[in-house]
Design a protein with these regions (language model features):
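Short, small-residue-biased leader/transition segments that mark boundaries at the very start
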Residues: 1, 6-13
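Histidine-/acidic-rich catalytic cores in large beta-rich domains
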Residues: 11-200
């Protein structure tokens, strides 16, 4: 799988090659796939095709996503949670070069020469086996790397390939944006308030 497995109360992994988010049970003791958040057609004909959750609503699936973040909310029912990410909005797979990502609405295939990436926030319902797009907004395009961080109502975005990072308010209006002159890319950007750090 591409990228690290994120340590949540249950384990979820973000897989670039399939543009999927995979929940893994018993990660360190007989791991097994619990369910998949992705497009059904990617998994068609495999042993996992019946594990793909149903997409509710009309939206383009995430493509090449990074920094998936699990969020519990006391206002949600048991078995529901939020999941937000930097949606690179790229359709590419080195292991499946003939797969038609454009049929899913993922028309970008370049790390640099794309139009738009997105912040995506899903509502996942494990009981119903569904996921829906609860929030999204456009951000500068980056086909690879990048990050998203919700912070006190604002959102910090790193579009890693062009070296752009920015903060947006709760209405997705740009507060400030910075561009670094870099030879490669910015892997991640996080903002900290330093409250509760050991040196205070």
């Amino acid at each position: 799988l591409h990228k690290a497995i994120h340590s949540f109360p249950t384990r979820r992994s973000s897989d670039l090659e399939t543009s999927s988010i995979i929940k893994i049970d018993s990660l360190y003791d007989g791991p097994s796939v619990s369910y998949i958040i992705g497009d059904q057609s990617v998994w068609e004909g495999t042993e996992y095709e019946n594990l793909v959750f149903t997409r509710q609503g009309d939206f383009t699936i995430q493509g090449g996503q990074h920094t998936i973040t699990y969020v519990e909310d006391p206002g949600l029912a048991e078995g529901q949670y939020y999941l937000y990410m930097f949606n690179n909005n790229i359709g590419i797979s080195e292991t499946r070069p003939d797969f038609d990502w454009s049929a899913l609405g993922l028309t970008e295939s370049s790390a640099e020469d794309g139009d738009t990436s997105y912040y995506y926030k899903y509502l996942v319902d494990e009981n119903a086996g569904t996921f829906s797009l609860e929030d999204s907004f456009e951000v500068p395009y980056s086909g690879y790397v990048s990050s998203a961080q919700d912070l006190g109502g604002n959102t910090v975005i790193d579009s890693g390939i062009p070296g752009i990072f920015a903060e947006y308010d709760k209405d997705h209006e740009l507060i400030a944006q910075y561009t670094m002159d870099t030879e490669k890319f910015i892997y991640r950007v996080y903002k900290y308030d330093f409250q509760g750090f050991y040196f205070q």
